[in-house]
Amino acid sequence: MLYPIPIAKLIESYSKLPGIGVKTATRLAFYTIGMSDEDVNDFAKNLLAAKRELTYCSICGNLTDDDPCHICTDSSRDKEIILVVEDSKDVSAMEKIQEYHGYYHVLHGLISPMNGVGPDDINLKSLITRLMAGEATEVIVATNATADGEATAMYISRLLKPAGIKVTRLARGLAVGSDIEYADEVTLLRAIENRTEL
């Protein structure tokens, strides 16, 4: 069915979001059209504000509205441990369990030879710089349990072990192929507590 151009464009915009197919995008577009002007304006304003006001922390790479982020400026955290994650959603998932008290490093991707993504294409150099300049003695690699997550974990391990840095991996309470952001708090807590050395 053909829709008027403004609705078709709105459907197209919604369907660019991850996990949103044409059917859901169509539902969202029609819902948006039915919203009050005030709600639509607030929605648009919030989208633009998030895009303009958020940045990446210059230390850890986490999404933040302050640079450095509130985690990196928290001196009560354990300076000896850095937990390495794929993206900012994983930081939020780990923070929900309120049991990890070290710092983070966000890679903004994973090494993926099949997709042409190498170590230089992710936020790895700044991790090395941080480790050489800081007090961290352990890196916990908390990438997802996928082929790319495993490849990234092994690369980080081979890179850091010669420097005398202990490299551990989250325990396997997480299903292979699953994303950290979708794991429940108990699973994440056990994965940290039972981490294994790489």
From Swiss-Prot:
Q: Which SUPFAM superfamilies match?
A: Recombination protein RecR (SSF111304)
Keywords, alphabetical: DNA damage, DNA recombination, DNA repair, Metal-binding, Zinc, Zinc-finger
Report domain Toprim positions. Answer: 80-175
Signal peptide range:
none
Q: Single Gene Ontology BP term?
A: DNA repair
SMART domains per the record?
TOPRIM
Establish whether keyword Zinc is in the entry: yes
Domain of life where this protein originates: Bacteria
Q: Which InterPro entries match?
A: DNA_Rcmb_RecR, Rcmb_RecR, Rcmb_RecR_Znf, TOPRIM_dom, TOPRIM_RecR
Zinc finger residue ranges, C4-type: 57-72
Listed as disulfide-bonded, the cysteine pairs are: none
Q: Which Pfam families match?
A: RecR_C, RecR_HhH, RecR_ZnF, Toprim_4
What molecular function does GO assign, one term? Answer: zinc ion binding
The record's comment on protein family reads: Belongs to the RecR family.
| Function per UniProt | May play a role in DNA repair. It seems to be involved in an RecBC-independent recombinational process of DNA repair. It may act with RecF and RecO.
Q: Indicate what this protein is called per its UniProt record.
A: Recombination protein RecR
Q: Which organism is it from?
A: Streptococcus equi subsp. equi (strain 4047)
Q: What is the lineage of its organism?
A: Bacteria, Bacillati, Bacillota, Bacilli, Lactobacillales
Q: Source gene?
A: recR
